[in-house]
Amino acid sequence: MESITGYVDHIVFQNSENGYTVMILMMEGEEVTCVGMCKGLGQGENITAEGEYIEHPVYGRQFKIQNYETVTPTDRVGMERYLGSGAIRGVGEALAARIVKKFGDDTFRIIEEEPERLAEVKGISERKAQEIAIQMEEKKDLREALVYLQQYGISNTLAVKIYNTYGAEMYSVMRENPYRLAEDVSGVGFRIADEIAGRIGIHTDSDYRIRSGILYTLLQAVGEGHCYLPLEQLLCRGAELLGVTEDNIRPQVDNLIVDRKLVAKGEAVFAAPYYYAELNCANMLRNLNIPMAESENLPSQDMAIRKRLERMAENLSMELDELQLKAVEESIKNGLFILSGGPGTGKTTTINMIIRYFESEGMDIFLAAPTGRAAKRMTEATGFEAKTIHRLLELNSALSGDDSRKANFERNQENPLEADVVIIDEMSMVDIQLFQALLKAILPGTRLILVGDVDQLPSVGPGQVLRDLMNSKAFPMVTLEKIFRQAGQSDIVVNAHCINKGEQIALDNKSKDFFLLERSDVNVIYKHMIQLIQDKLPRYVNATPFDIQVLTPMRKGSLGCETLNGILQRYLNPADPCKKEHACGNAVFREGDKVMQIKNNYQLEWEIVGRYNIPIDKGLGVFNGDMGRIREINDTSATLTVEFDDGRRVNYPFSGLEELELSYAITIHKSQGSEYPAVILPLLGGPRMLFNRNLLYTGITRARNCVTILGSSETVRNMIDNVSENRRYTALEQRIREVCDLPEICCLREEA
């Protein structure tokens, strides 16, 4: 690693979010182009940087900075250059020259120790002298903080966050309890805090360490979809993580309960936010579940509603069976209503009838779904605009601070949605935190209609909201089961219902939309997959190769999405001199690639452009599972532009590309809420807990026109027979029963 020293002549580009900087450094009269993460660095500053020279294919020789530290200039030229660079607000080149001429080599000492003397310089008042001194002190403090934190291997980007969080208190936090960082600073988790603690000599059985480890263990469980852990599991997992005994952990669990960071209900231990999320949801649901004013359940009124619905259906040429009509009636009579059912059972027709009824009443109707793809499908199916739930609630990054993990919304109890009816589709995808935010924005008296298929995989985030709502039996609900004539002609729909009931399906390839190609050799599967995507399926379903989606149960392995994406990229979007690309870890992103966002980021800005590239809409937030194409890679600004399927464009800094993955192949779990013209499922076998009925059902119901299974019929049959599922620890059902005074269940449910 080489070291260079010089001053920043000027900044070519600096990303305000992550600090990625392109700058010109002057070294003894020589200009050197430098690139790296240098957040907070400004023009005129003197630095010593470590890194290496690289040869950029377009911009030539550059110095790639790995670490740097700012150094205070000691000569008059350096002092004048720094003060006049714009680093100090209100001081230009002329004023900087007068200051240095007045105080000479003593300039910086005067500013730090006798700032009032700056008023001796023409053009500087006593107030301005103090402002200059304060700015110099702040920059000095930040420089010293960065140097201090670098010794613990903390990047400059994280170091700036830590300093901004604590200020001068940072040093005492680092010495006494670095585990506070894991709770207070976005980007610093338990692992980083634990490494710092080890370096400064904090013992492995420290109370601070054990408390932080317990919270981290529960956070990991939340990442697996749980809202709590049984005490014994928490003790076991915590002991394994921390390398201590369960006896060391138990007292700290009690202390965290006293501190209200944990909540214990019987043997269930919750991180406090998730206990209160479920409890708050239960209370708000109870408040919404009221008979509507126009309904007193009089027989004559029920008959009038039925006749009106029948007339409307006839006028709209809509065919509804008895259960669908009952569903519409329940949505009219109740403040809260749940509509469930599998594919082809008429949920969309029922939703359309509900919308038309309330539209005829002059009511304001809002439609939403968890993802952009699901919202787009809802719009196409109903003819009414549907938004993502995040857009409906008006995500606001200013309320979230610097933490990209947290969502805060403009719409809440103080500023509720101005709607008479809110309809949410794909409820199986909604986690407990998003559901809580939604309910906070809905006033009692507003109708809330929740729609979904409970047999789909549960949400990626914590909870199993739809299943718990239905299991509680506390709210009006209709489950549609009949497969309608048009849907009944689709073997995708018929087979989905058979699979869901545990019935074996025909795999004889006599279908027009459901095929199995029996293959046992992985390389042969690769070959056929490429042929299907490049040629056969696009012609068969009238789509492009990029519309065909490979869905796999696994991330790893020869048929996992990581391996498949590398193979499919080579054939579907090969390297080309006309296409820019950028390496990130083991992946290469190329213009034209199909990509997916793999975590929620509530800070990312997006815009939608119309004709002539004129922005017509903008907002915040890109979410786990959003898919799109790479439109541009810009090496100058170190950004990559993705256009998502719903038209949003997002500029990603190169440093933020760990949030993106190639998506020619994705896991079935990530496909929730999406629909594709054709789906390919490579199924040769794998872990029993993964290769189950629920996963197969979800995978095939993602296809609109064609399902092709590449692999083993035996694997398919085993999956249909396999009802083992990953259990989720949730208690929303229990909380609902408590607040609604329903009979208690004997134990908390553990459902998939």
Enumerate the language-model features and the residues they cover:
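Pre-Walker A segment
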Residues: A264-G342
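Accessory, non-ATPase domains that flank or precede helicase/AAA+ motor cores in DNA-metabolism machines
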Residues: M1-N297, A752
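A generic structural signal for residues embedded in beta-strands
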Residues: I11, A49, Q597, I630-I633, ...
